[in-house]
Curated annotation (Swiss-Prot):
Belongs to the cytochrome P450 family. Gene3D superfamilies: Cytochrome P450. The chain crosses the membrane at residues 1-21. Its EC number is 5.3.99.4, 4.2.1.152. Catalyzes the biosynthesis and metabolism of eicosanoids. Catalyzes the isomerization of prostaglandin H2 to prostacyclin (= prostaglandin I2), a potent mediator of vasodilation and inhibitor of platelet aggregation. Additionally, displays dehydratase activity, toward hydroperoxyeicosatetraenoates (HPETEs), especially toward (15S)-hydroperoxy-(5Z,8Z,11Z,13E)-eicosatetraenoate (15(S)-HPETE). It comes from the Eukaryota. Keywords: Endoplasmic reticulum, Fatty acid biosynthesis, Fatty acid metabolism, Heme, Iron, Isomerase, Lipid biosynthesis, Lipid metabolism, Lyase, Membrane, Metal-binding, Prostaglandin biosynthesis, Prostaglandin metabolism, Transmembrane, Transmembrane helix. This is Prostacyclin synthase. SUPFAM superfamilies: Cytochrome P450 (SSF48264). It is a single-pass membrane protein. It holds the Pfam family p450. The keyword Cell wall biogenesis/degradation does not apply.
């Protein structure tokens, strides 16, 4: 062996010795500490492979709070839903989401914003997603869903068409959402302009979907060389599609878009970075609705009793409406708010499939009080992680048969919404958390709920829809998606649909 090789081996051994000597020890008052068997990496491989299974094992071993080593970072995991409010409402000087958000923004979307303040941005965006602006968004979304769904069905004729359910749901909702937020070809609309809208928004979806499929690897920095080249190409295409100059001529742009672009200009953001910011916002506002609709429709198609209950509710609404749903140019908020069965189906779908990580950076050494009066010390520089998918959403103490879809789980016997769920004999405030919580709860929650419900109503009132094979099983999750919002399936589910005559 050459001297160079020996010196290299010695350097590696010294580095390993250094890493081993720096292995952290648990201090009094801290959560249980699990370092794993590999220096520095710790549990990174297990966590990345299947976060839910890994964290379930850790909970069984250590209880509802513990610290694990993951790729050089110490992550304290809290799985007691009674104690979540302590975290999500804490001061940013103690527990802050912003550093992690900025890290993902730069790593996934190549986006750098000067003096970026997520709290200020949310405050600017909030009015454009609520109240009167929410009504305008909801009405525009209904119009654009009709353009995407009914225009395509007219062009395709009245016969059966086959497609993957995820592709169908995702493409329909993202295309309509893009037109709603970023504008349409012309106003007033014509048959020609609507056809152009369908083609253009479909192009946006196809390109976006390529980026979406790479998102977990982008976030973890694990793309191959070939994938990196492909990611760069896809991002460049999206930046061109969503450039401020390209969007300037579009009609009926949302107040959200106008406000957000003004905000970016006031910050002195270049047009190139503005385009990247708009790609980020396309993912943030539209990336979860399509997968949600996929799971919801699949659960309905696999559960005839649930589908019958939703159909019965829609018939009641049609009977009570001032004019037929088929003739409505918009679904009034009053109608959208009077669908308790569909609301329960949506909540149950989200309970089973929404799996975001709620993360905070620990900004100072602090004591974290638990709901049961215990208190644990957290160290500055660590990361705190909540995973509501495990608890409360999949907790057998809170939900009987938590792995089973029950369409009426969130309904009381009198048909009203059920909100009373318990753990350890105490009523839970946070019993289902697909939208996050506290300072970082999703601003677009109402817009997303309205959009998904409108999509389901249009689909069930205008189309016949069925599985290609009745024996189709509910697919397994793509395990790499844990932490990024709605889970996606490992494979799509073939369906057939046709316009109802």
């Amino acid at each position: 062996m050459s001297w160079a090789a020996l010196l290299g081996l010695l350097a590696v051994l010294l580095l390993l010795l250094l890493l081993l000597s720096r292995r952290r020890a648990r201090r009094p008052g801290e959560p249980p500490l699990d370092l794993g068997s590999i220096p520095w990496l710790g549990h990174a491989l297990e966590f990345g492979k299947d976060a839910a299974s890994f964290l379930t094992r850790m909970k069984e071993k250590h209880g509802d709070i513990f610290t694990v080593l993951v790729g050089g970072r110490y992550v304290t995991v809290l799985l007691d839903p009674h104690s979540y409010d302590t975290v999500v409402w804490d001061l940013r000087t103690r527990l802050d989401f912003h550093p992690y958000a900025i890290f993902l923004m730069e790593r996934i979307f190549d986006l750098q914003l000067p003096n970026f303040n997520p709290s200020e941005e949310k405050a600017r965006m909030k009015p454009t997603l609520m109240h009167k602006d929410l009504q305008a968004l909801t009405e525009a979304m209904y119009t654009n869903l009709r353009t995407v769904l009914l225009g395509d069905s007219t062009e395709g004729g009245s016969g059966w068409q086959e497609k993957g359910l995820l592709e169908f749901s995702y493409s329909s909702l993202l295309s309509a959402g893009y037109l709603t937020l970023y504008g349409v070809e012309a106003s007033p609309r014509t048959h020609e302009s609507q056809a152009l809208d369908r083609d253009h928004s479909a192009d946006v979806f196809r390109t976006f979907r390529q980026l979406d499929l790479m998102l977990p690897k982008l976030a973890r920095g694990s793309l191959s060389v070939g994938d990196k080249d492909h990611a760069c190409s896809v991002k460049s295409r999206l930046w061109k599609l969503l450039s401020p100059a390209g969007l300037a001529s579009r009609a009926d742009r949302s107040s959200w878009l106008e406000s957000y672009l003004r905000h970016l200009e006031e910050m002195g953001v270049s047009e190139d970075m503005q385009a990247r910011a708009l790609v980020l916002q396309l993912w943030a506002t539209q990336g979860n609705m399509g997968p949600t609709a996929f799971w919801l429709l699949l659960f309905l198609l696999k559960n005839p009793e649930a589908l019958d209950a939703v159909h019965a509710e829609l018939k009641r609404i049609v009977w009570q409406a001032e004019k037929p749903v088929l003739q409505m140019t918009a679904l009034p908020q009053k109608i959208l708010d009077s669908m308790p069965v569909l609301d329960s189906v949506l909540n149950e779908t989200l309970r089973l499939t929404a799996a975001p990580f709620i993360t905070r950076e620990v900004m100072a050494d602090l004591a974290l009080p638990m709901a049961d009066r215990r208190e644990f010390s957290l160290r500055r520089g660590d990361r705190l992680l909540l995973f509501p998918f495990l608890s409360p959403q999949k907790d057998p103490e809170i939900y009987t048969e938590p792995e089973v879809f029950k369409y009426n789980r969130f309904l009381n016997p009198d048909g009203s919404e059920k909100k009373d769920f318990y753990k350890d004999g105490k009523r839970l405030k946070n019993y289902n958390m697909p939208w996050g919580a506290g300072h970082n709860q999703c601003l677009g929650k109402s817009y997303a709920i309205n959009s998904i419900k409108q999509f389901v109503v249009l689909l069930l009132t205008h189309f016949d829809l069925e599985l290609v094979s009745e024996d189709t099983e509910v697919p397994e999750f793509d395990l790499s998606r844990y932490g990024f919002g709605l889970m996606q399936p490992e494979e799509d589910v073939p369906i057939r649909y046709r316009t109802r005559l």
